[in-house]
Amino acid sequence: MKRSLFKSFGIILGMIAFSACSIKQTPQSTLNDRLNFASVQTSLLLKKAMASQKIPRTVTEDGHMHWTREGFDWTEGFFPGTCWYLYEFTKDSKWKEAASHFQKKFEDHRLMPLYHDLGFVFHCSYGQGYRITGNNEYKKILIDAGNTLITRFNPKVGCIRSWDVDKGWQSKRGWEFPVIIDNMMNLEMLFELSKITGDKKYEDVAISHADVTLKNHFRPDISSYHVVDYDSITGEVRNKQTAQGYAHESEWARGQTWGLYGYTICYRYTKDIKYLKQAEKIADFIINHPSIPSDRIPYWDYDAPKIPNEPRDASAAAITASALIELDGYSDKDYLSEAKLILSNLSSAKYLAAEGENHNFILMHSVGSIPHNNEIDVPLNYADYYYVEALMRLYNLDNKEQNSLKN
């Protein structure tokens, strides 16, 4: 959608009115500085990863490095994905080599049908690698991962199953066919596979999943449930709950932004206006929520009982910023200012680690799952990934605008 003259005029007025604020056009030097710091800090992390031959995930409660799990870990694609973005920015071959090296460690996971996070794992690693290099071996691996992922699709439900419920903590919740809002993020790989292969089967699954999720996951105020459980035979909704939020009816911060990012993706590939409208509604809900602090970095749950004395979630903020940058390119509304404000605050000393600190992760103060007493107020590899992605999106956008002015 082309931006209206009204939006363009509004942005100009906004830039004049806020000329002293961080939400004005981001100087290219500032973006360079932030990306250069990300490269320096992640270089230190890379040294540790190479020495251990493991993929960094987070830091434990007692201050030790926590590597991704053996077997399968939904976060294992983010570190090589960050390396791909840093290769795109620096053109330094060490990042390409690092990304290739670490994604190779989980290549066989593309054939594991027990996990729904194959899109997270493989799109963020091999998908970025294929986008940047065009390596056909990466394309083959992505196709395998996509074929495995769609085996979890139930036509009666119309969705891809999230967790299996025959073991672990998931077996204790009484679920039959749980679908989590996070699963919207796995659709990007499917849409991309239809684009690069010409086979609509991937896109058909993605569209069905997005449509059913749009129908059942969102409350009248556009906030999202975390988990919707379905009857696998009839396709009917059994219950709506949470796993990582404060309560079943609360608004888990990262869940809201998974939905924002997911429907922005859906619009990118389909140009179906209902997805754009949904993304805009979620964005407006997040931006205008009364629980969002002035620095725009949310508490881990908008309804957490001890606000303002609750942990922030920098990962949710980074995901939001990245999604808003893309959404701004499709919408008549101005979402870029909010994205820049979030990134400016994430880049402050309150959230951005000092060089060599924070176990060499970039961002501090993220939350994995408070109900599971896991990864609370720690760095997370996906917070770094989406922060760097957001910076790269802004960097590429600014370069595009500067080139258009020259032409």
Where are each of the predicted segments found?
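Glycan-recognition and catalytic cores of secretory/periplasmic carbohydrate-active enzymes
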Residues: Q25-N407
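Bacterial Sec-dependent N-terminal signal peptides
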Residues: M1-S29
